[in-house]
């Protein structure tokens, strides 16, 4: 039959009879012979808003099914806050003390050469930590300010480049408009000159045609004598048959 060691933590206001009756009910009357109360009363962390409790330790031989029954009853008992069951056949119990050689042996773990040393004898005070945190916050704030300033300068430079590009485009557009206007004016002037020249040519042709018609028109005035008439007719060009 395996041997167990059971440690229980009880409410500081509870009586020892609670754990005594529970052990007798589950394991029998002889199970409480080695039950004892430990001197330790402090808790590592508060339980139900209390920092102290009662510690009880007992060694007994019991089958597995009775251990399970003890666990079930301990879970429903309000005065029992915590419990720990150790199988002494496979693990070391809480009641065994280490040997003097092992207890006085000092073991210093090997520290990596890249690891920072931990000086526990000279812990940093709360004010030093606050100063370091304030310095770190100030450095972060300055870094953020520099980043924002650099970003603002970059945006300003980009905006200036865009403005210069827009101004250049506007100037090119105005120059193109002027060139087109000058080209149209030159074409209009040239067209007007051509029209005027054509009109003059047409007038000259019309005047020449009229002069030719008057020159070659037969004279029907009876006052001309026959000789002048013959001279005129001789000057008139002959039509080709």
UniProtKB/Swiss-Prot annotation:
Low complexity compositional bias: what residue ranges?
130-151, 161-182
Does Cell membrane show up as a keyword for this record? no
User: Which segments show compositional bias classed as Polar residues?
Assistant: 189-202
Keywords on record: Ribonucleoprotein, Ribosomal protein, RNA-binding, rRNA-binding
One example GO MF annotation: structural constituent of ribosome
| Basic and acidic residues: bias regions | 109-118
Enumerate composition-biased segments (Basic residues): 97-108
Name the InterPro entries on file.
Ribosomal_bS6 (IPR000529), Ribosomal_bS6_sf (IPR035980), Ribosomal_S6_plastid/chlpt (IPR020814), Transl_elong_EF1B/ribsomal_bS6 (IPR014717)
Give the family, as the similarity comment puts it.
Answer: Belongs to the bacterial ribosomal protein bS6 family.
- Mind telling me which CDD domains this protein's record contains? bS6 (cd00473)
The task this protein performs is described as: Binds together with bS18 to 16S ribosomal RNA.
Return the NCBIfam families for the record. S6
Q: What is the protein name for this chain?
A: Small ribosomal subunit protein bS6
**Region of interest: Disordered:** 97-241
The lineage's top-level taxon is Bacteria
Annotated GO biological process: translation
> Does this entry carry the keyword DNA-binding?
no
What GO cellular component entries does it have? ribonucleoprotein complex; ribosome
- Gene that produces this protein: rpsF
